[in-house]
Amino acid sequence: MDADLYQVIYIVTFFSHFGAVRYKQLCQQQGVSCRMMPVPRSLSSSCGTCVRCEDRYLPPDGPCFDEIEQIAAWDGQQYTTVYHTDAQED
């Protein structure tokens, strides 16, 4: 498959709805194309809101990023975990 035919979508999940709202605002300020949406069932069984970013995302550091639960990349077929809070704990 030609890489130019699709873009990577990043799904960023949060511990709270407020975290999602703040992250979306920061993305928009940085020129990152994003929108809020329900969390896909394959990423979480809990009801919640996530931010969908196209082509790039803001990394999990800086203001409000303690609200990020995980970042997953969707390549058109499957999700791959890019960042997860549990993986960062020692």
Language-model regions, residue ranges each:
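A short, structural micro-pattern
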Residues: Y6, S45, F65-D66
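Residue-level marker of intrinsically disordered, low-complexity segments enriched
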Residues: Q7-I9, G19, Q30, M37, ...
